[in-house]
C-alpha cells in the first residue's frame, strides 16, 4: 500500500495529526520550574513528571514539521483519522470501508444481478463472489469490465481497484455498467514472449537505446521508477477541421512516458518545443473503443481512448487515438497500465498465481495449462520410450493416437446396433461451454476479442454456409482464424474432421480434447475456452 505524504494532503505539524498531552490552560506551571534554557544538565536535579512532559512538548514544537504517516495509530478510538484528498488517487481504503453498497453486474448475455458489497471491496473480491454464485471454475482470468455503451468505451478493472469508488464516479442516470467476463489478456504482459507485446521499433529509452533486451529486463524497466523507458509510434489523433465542424483524423508521432502522453508537431522530433502534451498517466484511464468506425469515424478498428478521471460524461475532453494494427494497440494499452500502476500490477499477478496454486493444493481441479514447448511426441512401441524428432513421424503418431481414441470411443458407445450411440455423441457438444450455437463469424471474433486476443482462445459454432458443418474459431498471433469441421460417414457411423478425413473424431468433444494436447493442423493448442457464464 502506498501512502501519499505530501503536505497538501496531511497536516503540517504533528499536533494537528496526533495531539500530544499538555498542561491544561487553567493550571499554572509549578513555581519551581525554571525555563529550559537555565537548566544545567550536568547537575543532578529531581525532574517531576509534569516537567518532563513540558520539555517533551517544547522539543516537539521546536522540531521541523514532519507529517505523521500513520494517524490512525495514534488517534483516539472514537475519532477517525482525517485524510485529505481522494482515497482512490493514493490507493487507500475509503473512509468507511465497511459501508454496504449495491453494485449491479451484467453478464455477457445481458442478464443483470445486484450484489451487496462493502465499500472497500476490490474487483478481485467481487469476482470471487460472483464465481461462487455462478458455480464457475475459479481462475485468474475472471474480471470486471467497466463499460460505457454511450461512449463505446470499455476497460478491465485491475484486481486492486475499489468497485464502489469506480461506480460513484459515473454520471447519474447513465448507461454505464459492470460486465462479468473472462479476460485472458489481463496478465499476458508477464507471460508473453519478449517482442509479442512490445516490438523493438516501439520501445525506446531516454538513457540509451539497447537492442536485444530480455523480456524480464524490459518489464523491470517499466516497473522501476528510476528508469525512463518510453513507447513511441505513429497514431491517428481525432481533431476538429477548421471551419467545417467535422472531426478529422490526422497522423502524429506519439510518445508515452512516465510524465504523460505527448505527440510531436514536427515529424518524429523529440525536441520539447515540438512536443504537445495530451494527458497525464496518473490522472487518466485508458479504454478500448468498441464501435470506433460507427461512432467516431475511425479509419481502422484498432482504437483506444484516454479519458481523464475528472471527466464524467460527454464526448468533450476524450482523447481518442487510432493505431494501425492490433499489436500496436496492445502495446500502447499494456505500457499505459504499467506506467499507471507500476509494481502494484505485478503484485496483483503474484497474488493471483498464489491463489491459483493454493486452490490446486486444496484439491480444486486446476485448468490444464501447457505450452507448445513443453509437449513432445513420444514413441512407446519398444521396450523404452523415445522422443520423436522427425516432424512427419510425430504427425503420424498423432494420427494414430486419434485413431486409437476413435476405436476406444466406438467400443464404449457400442450397443446392440453398431452406431446407435451416434445420436448421443453428435449432440454432446451442446452441453460444453465452448459451443456457442449458430452465431456469425463477426460475433465469434467479437467474443474472442472481448475475452482477450491470446494464443489458444477458441470456441466452436455452427457453420452458416454448410448446414451440417461446424467452425472452430481460434486466436493466434492476435488474429482470429476459422477452421471448418465437416462431417463424414464411414460404415454407417458419423465422424468429424478438419483435414478432409485424415484425422477423424466421433464427436466434437473428442476433437476439442485431442487438440488441447496436440496441435495437429492448428497453429497452436486449444488453451482457453471462450465461454459465457450466466449470473
From Swiss-Prot:
Posttranslational modification: Phosphorylated on serine and threonine residues in response to activation of receptor kinases. Phosphorylated on tyrosine residues by TEK/TIE2. Phosphorylated on tyrosine residues by PTK2/FAK1, and possibly also other kinases. Phosphorylation is enhanced by activation of receptor kinases. Tyrosine phosphorylation is essential for activation of down-stream protein kinases. Phosphorylated on tyrosine residues in response to NTN1 signaling. Phosphorylation promotes stress granule disassembly during recovery after cellular stress.
Region (Disordered): 1-90
Residue numbers carrying Phosphotyrosine: 187, 341
Coiled-coil spans in chain: none
Segments forming domain PH: 228-341
An example Gene Ontology CC term for this record: cytoplasmic stress granule
Domain comment as written in the entry: The PH domain mediates interaction with membranes containing phosphoinositides.
Cited function: Adapter protein that interacts with the cytoplasmic domain of numerous receptor kinases and modulates down-stream signaling. Promotes activation of down-stream protein kinases, including STAT3, AKT1, MAPK1 and/or MAPK3. Promotes activation of HRAS. Plays a role in signal transduction in response to EGF. Plays a role in the regulation of cell proliferation and cell migration. Plays a role in the assembly and stability of RNA stress granules. Binds to the 5'UTR of target mRNA molecules and represses translation of target mRNA species, when not phosphorylated.
PANTHER family reported for this sequence: GROWTH FACTOR RECEPTOR-BOUND PROTEIN (PTHR11243), GROWTH FACTOR RECEPTOR-BOUND PROTEIN 7 (PTHR11243:SF25)
Gene Ontology MF terms: identical protein binding; phosphatidylinositol binding; protein kinase binding; RNA binding
Bilayer topology term: Peripheral membrane protein
Effect of substituting residue 263 to F: Abolishes interaction with FHL2
Compartmental location: Cytoplasm; Cell projection; Cell junction, Focal adhesion; Cell membrane
Gene: Grb7
PTM annotation (Phosphoserine): residues: 364
Domain Ras-associating: 99-185
Keyword 4Fe-4S found: no
Protein keywords: Cell junction, Cell membrane, Cell projection, Cytoplasm, Lipid-binding, Membrane, Phosphoprotein, Repressor, RNA-binding, SH2 domain
Native organism: Mus musculus (Mouse)
GO BP annotation list: negative regulation of translation; positive regulation of cell migration; signal transduction; stress granule assembly
Domain SH2: 434-530
Matches recorded under SMART domains: PH, RA, SH2
Protein name (record): Growth factor receptor-bound protein 7
Assembly: Homodimer. Interacts (via SH2 domain) with EGFR, ERBB2, ERBB3 (when phosphorylated), ERBB4 (when phosphorylated), EPHB1, INSR, FGFR1, PDGFRA (tyrosine phosphorylated) and PDGFRB (tyrosine phosphorylated). Interacts with SHC1. Interacts with RND1. Interacts (when tyrosine phosphorylated) with FHL2 and HAX1. Interacts (via SH2 domain) with RET and PTK2/FAK1. Interacts (when not phosphorylated) with ELAVL1. In stressed cells, but not in normal cells, part of a complex that contains at least GRB7, PTK2/FAK1, STAU1, ELAVL1 and TIA1. Interacts (via SH2 domain) with KIT (phosphorylated).
Domain of life: Eukaryota
Family that this chain belongs to: Belongs to the GRB7/10/14 family.
Outcome, altering residue 287 to F: Abolishes interaction with FHL2
Ranges of Pro residues composition bias in the record: 21-37
Amino acid at each position: 500500500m502506498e501512502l501519499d505524504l505530501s503536505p497538501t494532503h496531511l497536516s503540517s505539524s504533528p499536533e494537528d495529526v496526533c495531539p500530544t498531552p499538555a498542561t491544561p490552560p487553567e493550571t499554572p506551571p509549578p513555581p519551581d520550574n525554571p525555563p529550559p534554557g537555565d537548566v544545567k544538565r550536568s547537575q543532578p536535579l529531581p525532574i517531576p513528571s509534569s516537567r518532563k512532559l513540558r520539555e517533551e512538548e517544547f522539543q516537539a514544537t521546536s522540531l521541523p514539521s514532519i507529517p505523521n504517516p500513520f494517524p490512525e495509530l495514534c488517534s483516539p478510538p472514537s475519532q477517525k483519522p482525517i485524510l485529505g484528498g481522494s482515497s482512490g488517487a493514493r490507493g487507500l481504503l475509503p473512509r468507511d470501508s465497511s459501508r454496504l453498497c449495491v453494485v449491479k453486474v451484467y453478464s455477457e448475455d445481458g442478464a443483470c444481478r445486484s450484489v451487496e458489497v462493502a465499500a472497500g471491496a476490490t474487483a478481485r473480491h467481487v469476482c470471487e463472489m460472483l464465481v461462487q454464485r455462478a458455480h464457475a471454475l475459479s481462475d485468474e482470468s475472471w474480471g470486471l469490465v467497466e463499460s460505457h455503451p454511450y461512449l463505446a468505451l470499455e476497460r478491465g478493472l485491475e484486481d486492486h481497484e475499489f468497485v464502489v469508488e469506480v461506480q460513484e464516479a459515473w454520471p447519474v442516470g447513465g448507461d454505464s455498467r459492470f460486465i462479468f467476463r473472462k479476460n485472458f489478456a489481463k496478465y499476458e504482459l508477464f507471460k508473453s514472449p519478449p517482442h509479442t507485446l512490445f516490438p523493438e521499433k516501439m520501445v525506446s529509452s531516454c538513457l540509451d537505446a539497447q537492442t536485444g533486451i530480455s523480456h524480464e529486463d524490459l518489464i523491470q524497466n517499466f516497473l522501476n521508477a528510476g528508469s525512463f523507458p518510453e513507447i513511441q509510434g505513429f497514431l491517428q489523433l481525432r481533431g476538429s477541421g477548421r471551419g467545417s465542424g467535422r472531426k478529422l483524423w490526422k497522423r502524429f508521432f506519439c510518445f508515452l512516458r512516465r510524465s504523460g502522453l505527448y505527440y510531436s508537431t514536427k515529424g518524429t522530433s523529440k525536441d520539447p518545443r515540438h512536443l504537445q502534451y495530451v494527458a497525464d498517466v496518473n490522472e487518466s484511464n485508458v479504454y478500448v473503443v468498441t464501435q470506433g468506425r460507427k461512432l467516431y469515424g475511425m479509419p481502422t478498428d484498432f482504437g483506444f481512448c484516454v479519458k481523464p478521471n475528472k471527466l464524467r460524461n460527454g464526448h468533450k475532453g476524450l482523447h481518442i487515438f487510432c493505431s494501425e494494427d492490433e499489436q500496436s494497440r496492445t502495446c500502447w494499452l499494456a505500457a499505459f497500465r504499467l506506467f499507471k500502476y507500476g509494481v502494484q500490477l505485478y503484485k496483483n499477478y503474484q497474488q493471483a498465481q498464489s491463489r491459483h496454486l493454493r486452490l490446486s493444493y486444496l484439491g480444486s481441479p486446476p485448468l490444464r495449462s501447457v505450452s507448445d514447448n513443453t509437449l513432445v511426441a513420444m514413441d512407446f512401441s519398444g521396450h523404452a520410450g523415445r522422443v520423436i524428432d522427425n516432424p512427419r513421424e510425430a504427425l503420424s503418431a498423432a494420427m494414430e493416437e486419434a485413431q486409437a481414441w476413435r476405436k476406444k470411443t466406438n467400443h464404449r458407445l457400442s450397443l446392440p446396433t453398431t452406431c446407435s450411440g451416434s445420436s448421443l455423441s453428435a449432440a454432446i457438444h451442446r452441453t460444453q461451454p465452448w459451443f456457442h450455437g449458430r452465431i456469425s463469424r463477426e460475433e465469434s471474433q467479437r467474443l474472442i476479442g472481448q475475452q482477450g486476443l491470446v494464443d489458444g482462445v477458441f470456441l466452436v459454432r455452427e457453420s452458416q454456409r454448410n448446414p451440417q458443418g461446424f467452425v472452430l474459431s481460434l486466436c493466434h498471433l492476435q488474429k482470429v482464424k476459422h477452421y471448418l469441421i465437416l462431417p463424414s460417414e464411414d460404415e454407417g457411423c458419423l465422424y468429424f474432421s478438419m483435414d478432409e478425413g485424415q484425422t477423424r473424431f466421433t464427436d466434437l468433444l473428442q476433437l476439442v480434447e485431442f487438440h488441447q494436447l496436440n496441435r495437429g493442423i492448428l497453429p497452436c493448442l486449444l488453451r482457453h475456452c471462450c465461454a459465457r457464464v450466466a449470473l
